[in-house]
Structure formats: C-alpha cells, structure tokens
C-alpha cells in the first residue's frame, strides 16, 4: 500500500443524526418519514454530483412531498444539520500524514456545502491532497468513473503512477467500498478507529 483515500462524512465528520434530521424536517414543514425518500433518493445523487443546485433540489423535494418549501431556509437548515468533527480521527490522520503516506479525500457533497465544509474544517486541506468533492467532478459515488478520477489525482500527488491495488479506500458506505474493491482498490468499510488502525497496519 502506497496511498490512502478517505471518505469525509461518517469518518471525520459524524453523519447527520436522527434528531438533526427531525429538526430539518420541522423547518421545511414535512414529516420526517415523508421527507426521507425525497431527501435521500435520486434527487440527492444528482445534488451531490452537482448536476442540480440547491434551488432545483429543494423544488424537487417540494414536488414529491406536496409541500411548498423555502429552498434558502431549507439549505440553511441542511447545513446546520451537519455533524461534528471527530477529533480522534483527525488526530489519527495527522499521525498518518507524518509517516509520509499520500492521502486523499473523496466526498459526496453538494456545491453549496463545499465552502461551509472547508471553512469549518481547514485541516482537510492541510492533511489531504487531493481533496475531491463530487459536485466539482460532476460525478458521485458509487459511480466507477469517480474512482478513476481519484486514482489519477492521487498519482499526481504521489509523483508516480499508482495502481488501484496501491490504494486503501476507506468509506462507511458498504456499497462504495464494494465498487472500489471491484475496481481493484484495497477496501475498508469504516466502523471505528480501532478497526481502521488495525487494517492499515495489516496492509
């Protein structure tokens, strides 16, 4: 293994909690169980891939739920629902960075979330190169093409051509890890820091 490629949310920033989602649902005026399919389905894939913006995304959610939604208020509530930084994981990444590993980040994220994420998490640009956001690539995981782009960018950072088997890909989504390993990457489905540390030592 010569390089590491990490997801962001669910590893370094906690996933949106049920309580946060319920607060978001109240803001937009939709019952949580009604909101969830429209919020998480194909609309979110396109939103993450940057093929639609926040206004169109929330217009689609409104159409599917039958509720008139103020998209700007919804966006603000969506940003407020983002999770907290995991200090232990960030410290672990710093220790890995000092060992000389090439480390990249690949995150599914809408364009309107990028500025907020970078502002509140400046360590991401300090520790990872490249930092790749799906919306700027016009692709979203688990699309196979996004992994090819990430591998090429990791190779640039490493100063040598990397093969998929040179890279350990870490994500909390089993589907994303499944696709990456099918393409030849080493894979680890993240559950906790202890298991991740053991995996890195093993490879």
Describe each PLM feature range.
Residues 2-91, 98-99, 110-114:
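N-terminal helical cap/lid subdomain that shapes the substrate entry/recognition surface
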Residues 91-94, 98, 152, 178:
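Surface-exposed alpha-helical segments enriched in charged/polar residues
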